[in-house]
A protein has these predicted regions:
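Acidic/histidine-rich catalytic neighborhood of metal-dependent amide-processing enzymes
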Residues: 1-34
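Metal-dependent amide/peptide-bond hydrolase catalytic core
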Residues: 36-195
Length: 195
């Protein structure tokens, strides 16, 4: 919708984008970046498991570190207008595919996920931080330091964004909300990349 109107040449002083906000005024949003992680292993028959390297076990190390990394990132940023300061830029693994056969040590795991970008943080900086985290974590593992995971960025790459709460469009929306409900509007940030 929004992008189509811009491409067609429509302009405006402001825009109201309809997202499921429960009628909250949401002038600030986190960004969201889609990524793919490929974790290498070394395949061998399960009867000789000790001669192989399970990509699933190596992925488990990386996954646990991503959960800790998410917590660390939330301690570094101080962003107003969110329901919880610990839930501004979530990192989520949405799909995992690994192994070819039940009796083979898995040679690779491919995990795809979504990396949250804090308001005020550029997508470029967020990507670099994530890639650096994966690189540093890999250096602490005997296998991964020589066979590091591959990070790819694809599909949705949404920057964070915000509109000053004193901006006339925010003030107008808040006033309309008050006139309609008799209540003061709730200003709240959203944790997703909106168009």
């Amino acid at each position: 919708g929004t992008l189509t109107n811009i491409v067609k040449g429509f302009t405006a002083d402001g825009a109201v984008i309809l997202e499921p906000t429960s009628l909250k005024v949401c002038p600030i949003q986190s960004g969201a970046l889609t990524f793919r992680l490929t974790i290498p292993g070394r395949a061998t028959h399960a009867a000789m498991r000790w001669d192989g390297v399970s990509a699933i076990e190596k992925y488990s190390l990386i996954h646990q570190s991503i959960l800790e990394f998410e917590k660390e990132r939330h301690q570094l940023f101080n962003v107003q207008y969110y329901e919880s300061k610990r839930r501004v830029a979530p990192i989520n693994i949405g799909t995992i595919k690994g192994g070819e056969w039940h009796s083979t040590v898995p040679e690779s795991v491919v995990a795809e996920g979504r990396f949250g970008v804090f308001p005020g943080e550029s997508a470029k900086d967020a990507r670099e931080e994530f890639e650096n985290h994966i690189r540093q974590k890999s250096k602490s593992d005997e296998w991964l330091k020589d066979n590091p995971p591959i990070v790819e960025w694809f599909e949705g790459q949404f920057e964070s964004g915000q509109t000053d709460t004193r901006h006339p469009i925010i003030q107008s929306l808040s006033e309309c909300y008050f006139q309609s409900t008799g209540d003061k509007s709730i200003i709240e940030g959203v944790t997703y990349g909106s168009d």
